[in-house]
Regions:
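Negatively charged, low-complexity tracts enriched in Asp/Glu with abundant Ser/Thr
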Residues: 7-62
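Conserved aromatic-histidine-acidic binding/catalytic patches
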Residues: 30-33, 64, 98-101, 105
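Short, surface-exposed, charge-dense and proline/glycine-enriched linear segments
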Residues: 32-39, 85-96, 118-124
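Amphipathic, interaction-prone secondary-structure segments
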Residues: 52-80
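Intrinsically disordered, low-complexity regulatory segments enriched in Ser/Thr/Pro
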Residues: 77-105
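A recognition module on extended beta-rich or small alphabeta surfaces enriched in W/G with H and D/E
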Residues: 95-125
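Short, highly charged C-terminal tails/helix-capping segments
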Residues: 124-137
Length: 137
């Protein structure tokens, strides 16, 4: 099921332009993004974090959603890099209760789940030479 019609917003849109937590999340995702090129089974990854695969229709290679609080969903959106453009891992949020969450809490959930996803990458690629970040979680 796609997410057309759902309002997807960034942490910056929740907290405002000067969001320190958006910078924290961006930095954490940039350091971990390369590892997600090793994901072979997106459905398996979604199950591993208790989420689901969702097509957002925004040019992503894959995206997962996870309800982190009643009425609050986080979307992990991955685009593989190529010769012309670097890959990216982004996070968006939606839900009727998004405004009751603090940016600090949302950032913490994001980093927690991204680290958990790195464990999946490590466990499902035992013989691969993975990025160092996979071995630090």
């Amino acid at each position: 099921m796609g997410s057309i019609g759902k309002k997807l917003i960034s942490l910056r849109e929740i907290e405002g332009v000067a969001s320190p937590h958006q910078r924290q999340v961006d930095s954490a995702l940039a350091a971990r993004q390369k590892a997600f090129e090793y994901v072979k089974d997106v459905v398996g990854l979604a199950k591993y974090i208790g989420g689901k695969v969702e097509s957002l229709g925004i040019g992503e290679d894959w995206s997962l959603s996870k309800e982190i609080f009643p009425g609050v969903r986080v979307y992990f959106v991955f685009v593989k890099g190529d010769e012309e453009f670097p890959g990216s891992l982004k996070v968006l949020f939606s839900g009727k209760n998004i405004n009751v969450m603090k940016g600090e809490d949302l950032a913490g959930f994001v980093i927690l789940y991204v680290n958990h996803m790195l464990r999946y990458v490590r466990e499902t690629n035992p013989d691969a030479n993975l990025p160092e970040v996979c071995y630090r979680v």
